[in-house]
From Swiss-Prot:
Pfam families: DUF489
GO cellular component assignments: cytoplasm; plasma membrane
Membrane topology: Peripheral membrane protein
Name of the protein described by the UniProt record: High frequency lysogenization protein HflD homolog
Annotated family: Belongs to the HflD family.
SS bond partners: none
Main location: cytoplasm
Presence of keyword Transferase: no
Organism per entry: Acinetobacter baumannii (strain SDF)
Keyword Cell inner membrane set for record: yes
Position of the signal peptide: none
Subcellular location: Cytoplasm; Cell inner membrane
Domain of life, per lineage: Bacteria
Length: 244
């Protein structure tokens, strides 16, 4: 049985729980976008904070988890830990319809690339987790990395940890076509540490996509239920900021 990092006193409803997992995917793709465009040293402390939280979650998400008992917040400490993902997700689903949607969350400039990466990850996750060989690779890597952390003072952003996460992505989702093509600073892509960080971001998104699907998420439902999804995001925002 998987030992979950956090246990919540109050559970979200089914839709909110699923929406929060999807926000985790978008948090990963927003960090992928930020890293690719600005470089690994430029995403700031807040970016590293959100990234570390995703890594922790991705190492605990398992394909054998009891879906009925799992809550997205079992893998995070609080709603604020996925606030970047909530902002990104809301921006992505409202931007096509209006230039100035009403929102309780601050808007971001561009949603096109994070949205593209997220949709690709949702498709890749289904293919990865339908292949027992890829699932075994992920589970083996999770166990290896969790053991390694003790040697690196639990530094989830240590280059060796990121390199292992990146390699896990390459060995699984990276073997499936069409591959995700990340746009960014061409010169920075020559740096192995930079590309490892991007691939590690994508791996965390892959894992959050798996959690989302475990919770009943489907691409078709997301496409045709955008209004309900937006309502769920706004409800989560009210819970996060205690808006009355």
């Amino acid at each position: 049985m998987v030992e979950l990092p956090f246990q919540q006193s109050q559970a979200l409803n089914v839709r909110q729980n699923r929406a929060l997992a999807l926000a985790g995917v978008f948090q990963a793709t927003q960090l992928t976008h930020m890293t690719a465009m600005t470089g690994q040293q430029s995403i700031g402390e807040s970016g590293n904070f959100y990234f570390e939280l995703l890594i922790k979650a991705s190492l605990n998400i398992r394909p054998t988890t009891n879906n009925n008992a799992v809550q997205t917040l079992d893998f995070f400490n609080q709603l604020a830990d996925i606030s970047l993902g909530l902002k990104t997700l809301e921006n992505c689903i409202t931007q096509p319809f209006t230039n100035a949607p009403k929102s309780r969350l601050p808007k971001m400039r561009s949603a096109k690339l994070p949205m593209s990466y997220a949709m690709s990850l949702l498709q890749l996750e289904k293919k990865v987790y339908s292949n027992p060989e890829y699932v075994a690779i992920i589970e083996k890597a999770q166990q290896k990395i969790l053991k390694q952390l003790s040697f690196f003072d639990n530094n989830y952003l240590h280059p060796s940890i990121l390199a292992n996460l990146a390699q896990t992505y390459v060995d699984t989702a990276g073997q499936i076509n069409p591959r995700i093509l990340v746009r960014g600073n061409a010169e920075a892509f020559k740096d192995t540490n930079h590309t490892n960080r991007i691939r590690a971001c994508l791996f965390t998104g892959l894992q959050m996509a798996h959690l989302w699907r475990q919770l009943g998420g489907s691409s078709w439902n997301m496409i045709f239920s955008k209004r309900k999804l937006l309502q769920d995001i706004q409800a989560l925002a009210r819970l996060q900021y205690q808006v009355i």
